[in-house]
UniProtKB/Swiss-Prot annotation:
Glycosyltransferase that specifically catalyzes mannosylation of cytoplasmic tRNA(Asp) modified with queuosine at position 34 (queuosine(34)). Mannosylates the cyclopentene moiety of queuosine(34) in tRNA(Asp) to form mannosyl-queuosine(34). Mannosylation of queuosine(34) in tRNA(Asp) is required to slow-down elongation at cognate codons, GAC and GAU, thereby regulating protein translation. One of its GO terms (cellular component) is nucleus. Belongs to the glycosyltransferase group 1 family. Glycosyltransferase 4 subfamily. It is an enzyme of class 2 (transferase). It comes from Mus musculus (Mouse). Signal peptide: none annotated. One of its GO terms (biological process) is tRNA modification. SUPFAM superfamilies: UDP-Glycosyltransferase/glycogen phosphorylase. It is found in: Cytoplasm; Nucleus. This is tRNA-queuosine alpha-mannosyltransferase. Residues 199-227 are annotated as: Disordered. Keywords: Cytoplasm, Glycosyltransferase, Nucleus, Transferase. The keyword Magnesium does not apply.
Length: 445
């Protein structure tokens, strides 16, 4: 095995990426730690891996997420330190919002800076992630009382590049209501085009949004599903593997499908809003749920599905809102089965983000692929990914738009998304990751 993949936080998007890389690369070996107690993983994972990764003369490349303190690992294991070292940033700690800053929090961002200095290639999942990290280094280091290091941005920047997080969009045709079939056909067509030209288009520069394509043949000649199967099968994996589709289980689903499918083709049924994010303060559930409660007080008709993972400390607003929203709630809580999760997204009309912290946003793109109309803050990574039509500047603007949508849900259901999801697909990006990981290291590394 010539490629060592290390993931100190093996869950969520971190795990998704690693699993895709393992499918693409035969010549790799994976070492992981479970996705819990993030702060302890960031502090101590390097020592653990230094003792548990066996030595091998065949290793050529090391790939790790920025949770790992790469500097410590390279010092503890000089044999690993000599490899071509690739550091991938899903998020960065220099601009992470904390409830109450403590001096110990400095160490997390500092470790990421040190890891960049040791790495040979530093990869970010978005231009926003890269620029927010690099341009914050100077300000961040001013927290040091004296004898501060200098010029680190200029040292690190030449190593940096953007390769978007790759999403394997699954086969959702069997979940799609008829009014979304034209949308799905367009998504599959554009993903296929992106796969064919994956090595041509560069990632956008900071401040530049992913370019739009004019939809060709968006309107379908038929409202039937069968011909979607062949298109999807060809896109599940750029090579031969076809596990991108979601298996239909014979077991009883935790969700009752009739709850979602009943009246799915009624254009005047209540607007279905979904919020598919972690139940933590950095995703700002308070803003979202307070807006919904205000809509409820105005006697506006809507349904809501609040998805996403929950952890030990769940914000109090969730229990308060669930009670206040009452019969408007269709689903409340995390859906561990992917088919249940995508079923909800396909039946929903609008997907909302209220995040204070987002460097990519897998859940929003998955929902858009499933035909949801996105509403996102005009901040963070969102302007890089979504056209201006789908961005809001204030909670008041979000509330106003949702009020309008509640009154005319039929208009939203006729809407065809004007942006792109294709540049973020595994079909489009797998070649870039393969090239990154299989290119021979320079002789002077």
């Amino acid at each position: 095995m010539s490629i060592v993949i290390i993931e100190a936080f093996y869950g969520g998007s971190h795990r998704q990426l690693v699993e895709l890389l393992r499918e693409e690369l035969d010549d790799c070996v994976l070492y992981t730690l479970p996705a819990k107690k993030w702060h302890w993983r960031a502090r101590t994972a390097a020592l653990y891996f230094s003792q548990n990764i066996p030595s091998s003369e065949h290793y050529r490349t090391l790939f790790a997420s920025s949770v790992l303190n790469l500097t410590e690992l390279a010092a503890l294991r000089p044999d690993l330190g000599k490899l071509k070292k690739i550091l991938y940033f899903h998020e960065n700690q220099l601009v992470y919002p904390v409830k109450k800053y403590q001096e110990r929090d400095f160490q997390y961002g500092y470790n990421q800076i040190l890891s960049c200095l040791v790495a040979d290639v530093v990869v970010f999942n978005s231009s926003f992630n890269m620029e927010s990290f690099l341009t914050s280094i100077g300000k961040f280091l001013k927290l040091i009382p004296d004898h501060r290091p200098k010029d680190l941005e200029s040292i690190i920047r030449p190593k940096c590049q953007v390769i978007y997080f790759p999403i394997r969009f699954p086969d959702v045709s069997r979940f799609m209501p008829k009014h979304k079939i034209a949308h799905l056909r367009r998504m599959l067509s554009l993903i296929g085009d992106a796969a064919a030209s994956q090595s041509v288009a560069p990632c956008p520069q900071p401040g530049q949004r992913v370019s739009e394509k004019s939809p060709e043949n968006c309107e379908s000649k038929s409202d039937e599903h069968p011909d979607l199967d062949a298109e999807q099968e060809a896109l599940d994996n750029p090579s031969v593997h076809k596990s991108g589709s979601l298996p239909v289980s014979k077991e009883n689903l935790p969700l009752d499908p009739s709850t979602l499918l009943c009246g799915a083709e009624d254009p005047q049924r209540p607007l279905h809003i979904t919020w598919p994010h972690r139940w933590e303060h950095d995703k700002d559930p308070e803003t979202f749920l307070k807006i919904l409660m205000s809509l409820k007080q105005l006697n506006l008709n809507f349904h809501v599905s609040v998805l996403g993972e929950t952890f030990t400390d769940t914000p109090d607003i969730f229990s308060e809102a669930k009670k206040a929203l009452g019969s408007s709630v269709l689903h409340w809580g995390y859906l561990p089965r992917k088919e249940d999760y995508f079923r909800v997204l396909c039946m929903a009309d609008v997907v909302i983000s209220t995040a204070k912290h987002e460097f990519f946003g897998v859940a929003m793109l998955e929902a858009v692929y499933c035909g949801c109309y996105p509403l996102c803050p005009k901040a963070l990574v969102y302007p890089e990914i979504f056209p201006a039509e789908y961005l809001y500047s204030t909670p008041e603007q979000l509330s106003k738009r949702l009020k309008s949508f509640c009154k005319r849900p039929d208009i939203i259901r006729k809407h065809l998304y004007k942006g792109e999801v294709a540049p973020f697909s595994w079909a489009a990006l797998h070649g870039k990751f393969r090239s990154l990981l299989t290119t021979e290291p320079r002789e002077d590394l």
